[in-house]
Every structure is written in structure tokens, then in C-alpha cells.
Swiss-Prot record:
It catalyses: L-glutamate = D-glutamate. The lineage of its organism: Bacteria, Pseudomonadati, Pseudomonadota, Alphaproteobacteria, Hyphomicrobiales. Signal peptide: none annotated. The gene is murI. It is an enzyme of class 5 (isomerase). This is Glutamate racemase. PANTHER family: GLUTAMATE RACEMASE. Keywords: Cell shape, Cell wall biogenesis/degradation, Isomerase, Peptidoglycan synthesis. It comes from Brucella canis (strain ATCC 23365 / NCTC 10854 / RM-666). Gene3D superfamilies: 3.40.50.1860. Belongs to the aspartate/glutamate racemases family. The keyword Nucleotide-binding does not apply. Transmembrane segments: none annotated. InterPro entries: Asp/Glu/hydantoin_racemase (IPR015942), Asp/Glu_race (IPR001920), Asp/Glu_racemase_AS_1 (IPR018187), Asp/Glu_racemase_AS_2 (IPR033134), Glu_race (IPR004391).
């Protein structure tokens, strides 16, 4: 497996900046969470970290991936001293969130888990599908959420192999085969006893980048449930309120890629999000 080169993280500034909010994902999907977080907290500073050297996480053996993420966060925390860390990746959250909290108890961690509870509260038909990576689908954590919050619903788990990579291609402006997307989402749509699936939970932060494509390809309209706004509100709730007297050293929001080799399209995308390398 590819690993980030040793000593690849920028040195911590000598003048302490405002402690940032760290947003972490395996790729660019976490930008959907960053976008909502900025709406909720426009006065905060962010550092976006993509573990593109390890992407896609679905190809990893679980224990090896756990070790990788825990080790990476040791570097991130030492270099950026985050006020809070957000795991903007369902696969990583369902696998390693509790391990991170134990390893770094001084840092509050917010995870991204499938929005099964709000889906169960909103559905009219009782037919809900969860569109996720195969790793998220197979985790006991996901099934525990269904048992706890959606036991009265019919919940179908749909493991989409490769859809996150298609989303990355789409956001880069690259072409892709829509038939492949249709094949991935088709199992989400169920008709039973005169009722139809009315909510599809987007249980991967990459998928909202495809939502317009998903709406167009869907056999009937559904609510594509994106948890990013709820995650942003949770982040804000864990941070101390600011007063007008608070003063901070003004610094840009940053982006860091573990490969240290983001291509031109990704650099342009990050700049479009106001992130500096």
C-alpha cells in the first residue's frame, strides 16, 4: 500500500495562528462537509486534508487502514493543533472513530455516519435505501444504526463499488459512463405493496457531487439525504462561542494531500474552494 512520504507535512508556524478545524477525507468528498461548515461557521479557519495516497479506502485491509489513519492523525495534530477534527468519510468513521478518540483524547472528533435516523424519521413509505461504499455496508456499526433507529422501516443497504471514484472523476471534469452509475444505484429503488423507496441516504461524502446525475438517472423522484449540514451543526455545537473581543492571527484556509502530488485539476478545485497549498 502507498504511504505518505516521511517528513511530508509543512512545519508548524512559529507564530501560533487561530487553532483550525481539521476536515479529513480519503479524497475530495469531504469538501461537501467543508462547504456546509463554512456556511455555519464563516468566521472559523479550516485545514482540509485528503489522504489521496491511500485512496480508495475500500481496497485496504481493515487493521492496516486503522493503523494508517491513527498514525497520520499523530502527524496532523502535531502540525496543526486543531481545535476539533472532523472525519468527513463514512468508511473511516465507521472503522476508526472510536480508536482516534482513545488515541488523542485532547481533540474532539466528529464522525460521519450514515444518516439512517433522520431517514427513518422522514420516510413516508417506510422504504429507505442506504447508498454506501462496500466497507460501510459490511460494518456492524451500520447495522446497529438500523436496529437502533430504523427497525420499523425496510432498509436496503447498497454497496456501490467504484462510485466514489466516479464522483472524483466528475468533479475533475472528466467523462464517465452513466450506465455504470445507473447500475450502481438501481438496487436502491424498491417497489413493495404499492409503495416505493422515497429516501436514499448518501452514505459517502463523495456522492453529493453526483446528486444532479443521480436525480436525472433515478427511475422516480426520491429525497437524496446528504448529512453534511447536520455534521456542520454538530461541529459548531462542540466549539466555544466567540465574543467580539476575540482576536486571531489571520491565516488562509489550507489544503494538504498525503501524496504531495495533487494534479492540476485538483489544485484548481482547491483554489475554487478558497484553499491554499
Amino acid at each position: 500500500m502507498k504511504k505518505a512520504p516521511a517528513g511530508s507535512f509543512p512545519a508548524k508556524p512559529t507564530i501560533a495562528p487561530e487553532r483550525p478545524i481539521l476536515v479529513f477525507d480519503s479524497g475530495i468528498g469531504g469538501l461537501t462537509v467543508l462547504r456546509e461548515a463554512r456556511v455555519v461557521m464563516p468566521d472559523r479557519r479550516f485545514v482540509y486534508i485528503a489522504d489521496d495516497a491511500g485512496f480508495p479506502y475500500g481496497n485496504w485491509e481493515e487493521e492496516a487502514l486503522k493503523r494508517r489513519i491513527i498514525e497520520l492523525f499523530g502527524e496532523f495534530i502535531a502540525n496543526y493543533d486543531p481545535e476539533i477534527a472532523v472525519i468527513a468519510c463514512n468508511t473511516a468513521s465507521t472503522l476508526v472513530l472510536e480508536d482516534l478518540r482513545r488515541a488523542y483524547p485532547s481533540v474532539p472528533f466528529v464522525g460521519t455516519v450514515p444518516a439512517i435516523k433522520p431517514a427513518a424519521e422522514r420516510t413516508s413509505s417506510g422504504l429507505v435505501s442506504v447508498l454506501a461504499t462496500p466497507g460501510t455496508v459490511k460494518r456492524a456499526y451500520t447495522r446497529d444504526l438500523i436496529q437502533s433507529f430504523a427497525s420499523r422501516c425496510h432498509v436496503r443497504l447498497v454497496g456501490a463499488d467504484g462510485l466514489a471514484a466516479i464522483a472524483e472523476a466528475h468533479i475533475r471534469g472528466e467523462s464517465f459512463d452513466e450506465a455504470l452509475v445507473m447500475a450502481q444505484i438501481a438496487p436502491c429503488f424498491i417497489e413493495k405493496d404499492g409503495k416505493r423507496t422515497d429516501i436514499v441516504v448518501l452514505a459517502c461524502t463523495h456522492y453529493p457531487f453526483l446528486v444532479n446525475v443521480l436525480r436525472r438517472l433515478a427511475p422516480w423522484p426520491v429525497d437524496w439525504l446528504d448529512p453534511a449540514e447536520a455534521i456542520a451543526r454538530r461541529m459548531k455545537s462542540l466549539l466555544p462561542a466567540r465574543s467580539d473581543d476575540d482576536e486571531f492571527h489571520s491565516q488562509d484556509d489550507l489544503a494538504f494531500f498525503t501524496s504531495r502530488k495533487p494534479d492540476y485539476a485538483i489544485r484548481r478545485l482547491m483554489q475554487g474552494f478558497g484553499l491554499r497549498f
